[in-house]
Amino acid sequence: MKVVDMHCDTISALLAEKREGKAAELKENDCHVDILKMQRGDYLLQNFALFVDMEAYADPWEEVQALFALYTQEMEANREWIAPVLTWSDIEKNRAGGRMSAMLTVEEGGVCGGSLAKLEELYGQGVRMLTLMWNYPNGLGYPNLNKHKRKAARIAAEEKSRTEAERLVRQYLNTPDTENGLTDTGVAFVQKMEELGMIIDVSHMSDAGFYQVLSLTKKPFVASHSNARAVCPCVRNLSDDMLRSLAERGGVTGLNFCADFLTQMPYGEHNPGTIAAVVSHAKHIVNVGGIECLGLGSDFDGIDTHAELTGADKMENLWNALKESGFTERELDKIWGENVLRLYREVLTA
């Protein structure tokens, strides 16, 4: 089975490099993901997120449109090897034609400014998955990791002993928001997304928001790049109850290669990331939710380089490690892509 990855931030990384005057292109670059690395990694489909840091731009909508323009340009420049998909049949057509597929997503629903018309405009531009929020509260709801609170925790930690500093930072990282969920506008967005056939992504969302999405929807949804909280207690990961609920709905969570979402190191120590840690999360998620709820969500180009999974061309190393840990090839086929493709087939319009 070829790789189907639900999340990377490569388009945002490329635009940042271009603004620095670098000759950054999707065909070949120094990022985690490019066409050549994907070919070596045997990819079928990559979700390309248009990620916008809401507090870094005066007009987040303008920024997401700049990212969309670059994505469109790169798809045209690389049309021999990869093509965008809007429907399930597009994926099948690309596969039959020997081309990889690209699915356009947006990471930060706040770019719409609460406008359902802008949400529909994104859909018209080809966006088929939306991560409702990143690490700030927005007009749609609340995240579990709030960058404003992180800054306050780190400032407070600087004035404390190492033990107390670690306690403060861990308290921030490991305490989920079980009270603040979706706003009324967020509820309307979730309902409109399900109506459109746009996949709802709950990665980054507060626990309260997750359960609201569960109650508001009927179709499967995803946590495109989230791991298991029982293995690494950071609240960017899903609790066992959330994993079971996601699985019962037919949803999928994507293994995230971010080292800090895989293991927690002592305060101040560098976390390089290991394949063994990814395997631990995979085994736990499958034990809790079953083999059907697990996929891939690397977070490539949105994270520091993982020491053992340095890019899209290294995916075989993870396959081999998972196989050595006891996963069968049939189970690996499901993790590598079949589970995500099953969900796409169900949610995306024909």
Named regions from a protein language model:
Residues K2-D5, L45, S101-T105, R128-M129, ...:
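Structural preference for beta-strand elements that scaffold enzyme active sites
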